[in-house]
Swiss-Prot record:
It comes from Xenopus laevis (African clawed frog). One of its GO terms (molecular function) is structural constituent of chromatin. Residues 40-113 form the H15 domain. Residues 1-45, 123-217 are annotated as: Disordered. It is found in: Nucleus; Chromosome. Residues 1-11, 28-45 have a biased composition (Low complexity). Histones H1 are necessary for the condensation of nucleosome chains into higher-order structures. One of its GO terms (cellular component) is nucleus. Keywords: Chromosome, DNA-binding, Nucleus. This is Histone H1C. Belongs to the histone H1/H5 family. Residues 123-151, 159-217 have a biased composition (Basic residues). Disulfide bonds: none annotated. SUPFAM superfamilies: Winged helix' DNA-binding domain (SSF46785).
Length: 217
């Protein structure tokens, strides 16, 4: 009989728990709702200044004439009626406009030429002052360049010190001259003594011969 292999039964793994999907937090809506968008284009004060400067009336521009000019340019005068009045009052208080007639927003208005002239002069002065401040910066950089030749002059001043060494060579020839002079003076003296001794010997020999000859006679 064939033996059957015993198969061990392993316990099945527990089923994986499904991952809980994180809920995306929705952005909270602003309590006040969407903010009102600012109107694109030039402001009411800018339009008023342009229309007043464009008019050629000597007595100034009235409020009714301003509204007509702005409406022709595509500006909604009926909706922005309150803004126009506030802008006119603000321009008068700043001094950009002068009120010729009436009071408040009603009346006629002109540009204040004196204030415009002062603004133009102030802008012109700023442009002239700016380049003057830049000139000293370039002037400071120029004197830095001549510093390099100083190193060359210092090196040239140090180099002549090396020429002092040949002085030692001039001292050395003095010793051999003194030695030669002593030898020359001593040698003739010795030679002079030798002939004197020889002459004395010859004289003695002659005298001895003369004595022998006299004795024989």
């Amino acid at each position: 009989m064939a033996e059957t292999a015993s198969t061990e039964t392993t316990p099945a793994a527990p089923p994986a728990e499904p991952k809980q999907k994180k809920k995306k937090q929705q952005p909270k809506k602003a309590a006040g709702g969407a903010k009102a968008k600012k109107p694109s284009g030039p402001s009411a004060s800018e339009l008023i200044v342009k229309s007043v400067s464009a008019s050629k009336e000597r007595g100034g521009v009235s409020l009714a004439a301003l509204k007509k000019a702005l409406a022709a340019g595509g500006y909604d005068v009926e909706r922005n009626n309150s803004r126009l009045k506030l802008a006119l009052k603000a321009l008068v208080t700043k001094g950009t406009l002068t009120q010729v007639k009436g009071s408040g927003a009603s009346g006629s208005f002109k540009l204040n030429k004196k204030q415009l002239e002062t603004k133009v002069k102030a802008v012109a002065k700023k442009k002239l002052v700016a380049p003057k401040a830049k000139k000293p910066v370039t002037a400071k950089k120029k004197p830095k360049s001549p510093k390099k030749p100083k190193k060359v002059s210092a090196a040239a001043a140090k180099s002549p010190k090396k020429a002092k060494k040949p002085v030692k060579a001039a001292k050395s020839p003095k010793k051999p001259k003194a030695v030669k002079s002593k030898k020359v003076t001593k040698s003739p003296a010795k030679k002079a003594t030798k002939p004197k001794a020889a002459k004395a010997k010859i004289a003695k020999a002659k005298a001895a011969k003369g004595k022998k000859a006299a004795a024989k006679k």
